[in-house]
Design a protein with these regions (language model features):
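Cys-nucleophile CN-hydrolase/nitrilase-fold catalytic domain and related Cys-dependent amidase chemistry
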Residues: 11-13, 21-93, 97-99, 164-193
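Hydrophobic residues at beta-strand termini and immediately following loops
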Residues: 6, 100, 126, 198, ...
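Extreme N-terminal starter segment of soluble prokaryotic enzymes
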Residues: 1-5
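Active-site catalytic loop in hydrolytic enzyme cores
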Residues: 57, 80-157, 161, 167-168, ...
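Binuclear metal-dependent phosphoesterase catalytic core
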Residues: 217, 221-247
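Short, acidic/polar
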Residues: 16-26, 143-149
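CN hydrolase (nitrilase-like) catalytic-core segments centered on the catalytic cysteine
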Residues: 57-73, 142-228
Length: 253
C-alpha cells in the first residue's frame, strides 16, 4: 500500500481546497491513500470565525469527487445542522466513506477547542480496500480510552491527523515530539497496527507547528518520516517497508 503524507502549511482561511486538489492531482497516480493534517481545510486558530468558515459536506463535493481516483484523509470544521465538529474524513470512491468527530477537545493553556466545537462520542473502525482502518484527531490519542478502543479493534491502519504546536525545547530536542512518538509507538505495538501520523507546519499567531509526520510499523519501527518545520509531501510503500523491517528483525532477532 502506498501512503502519501501531505505535511502542509494551510492558510488560516477557507482558501485551502485548491492546495488539496493540487497535491491530490500530483500524487494520485503513485498513491493509494493521501493523508492531510487536522483542520487541513482551514488552519487551526479559527476561533470565532469557525461559525462562518465551517463546511458542510456539500461544500467540499469537489474533494469527495477527487476520491474516485485515490482515497483521501483530511481534516475540517464540519457543519452538521447547528453543530460544528473538528472532524476527520475518509473519502473513497467518490463518497464520504467515514466521519470521525474529535472526541476530546483540549481546553487548557494555548488550546480553546471546547469553546468552538461540539465533541464527538464515537471512535469506530471501518473497512477500506486496503483493510480495516480507524481515524482519530490529535488529542484523541492522548486518552487511554481511545488507545484501548484502537487496541480492541486492531485495525490494519490507524490514521492520526494532528495540529501539534512546538513547545518544550531542550538540549535533547523537542519534548512534544518525543511524547508523541511514545504514544504512537505504544499504540502501534498494543494494537498491531500500522500508524500513520500527519502533523502540519507553519505559524499562526505565535504558534509554530513542527511537522515530523511519520509512519510507524506494528513492531514500533519508524518506516518513514518527514522533516521538521517545513512543508513536505512524502510517499511510502508500506508493503515494502514492512517487509524490509520484518526481514531485519528476523536477521538480527
Amino acid at each position: 500500500m502506498k501512503i502519501t503524507l501531505a505535511q502542509i502549511t494551510p492558510k488560516l482561511s477557507t482558501d485551502n481546497i485548491q492546495l488539496h486538489l493540487d497535491i491530490i492531482n500530483e500524487y494520485k497516480k503513485e498513491s493509494d491513500v493521501i493523508v492531510f493534517p487536522e483542520l487541513s481545510l482551514h488552519g487551526y486558530l479559527l476561533q470565532d470565525k469557525v461559525y462562518e468558515n465551517a463546511y458542510t459536506l456539500d461544500d467540499i463535493q469537489i474533494l469527495v469527487d477527487a476520491s474516485k481516483e485515490v482515497d483521501i484523509v483530511l481534516g475540517l470544521a464540519l457543519k452538521e445542522r447547528k453543530a460544528i465538529y473538528n472532524a476527520g474524513l475518509y473519502l473513497s470512491g467518490g463518497k464520504v466513506h467515514h466521519i470521525h468527530r474529535k472526541n476530546h477537545l483540549p481546553n487548557y493553556g494555548m488550546f480553546e477547542e471546547a469553546r468552538y466545537f461540539f465533541k464527538g462520542d464515537t471512535t469506530e473502525m471501518f473497512d477500506t480496500s486496503f483493510g480495516e482502518s480507524m481515524v482519530v484527531v490529535c488529542e484523541d490519542l492522548w486518552r487511554s480510552s481511545i488507545i484501548s478502543r484502537v487496541s480492541e479493534n486492531k485495525p490494519k491502519y490507524l490514521y492520526v491527523i494532528a495540529n501539534s504546536p512546538a513547545r518544550d525545547f531542550s538540549d535533547e530536542g523537542l519534548l512534544i515530539e518525543s511524547q508523541w512518538q511514545s504514544i504512537l509507538k505504544s499504540t502501534a505495538l498494543l494494537s498491531g497496527t500500522t500508524v500513520v501520523f500527519v502533523n502540519r507546519t507553519g505559524f499562526e499567531d505565535g504558534l509554530g507547528f513542527w511537522g515530523g509526520s511519520l509512519v510507524i510499523a506494528p513492531n514500533t519501527e519508524v518506516l518513514q518520516k518527514c522533516h521538521y518545520f517545513k512543508p513536505e509531501v512524502l510517499t511510502i510503500d508500506t508493503s515494502k517497508a514492512l517487509f524490509d523491517a520484518n526481514r531485519m528483525i528476523m536477521k538480527h532477532g
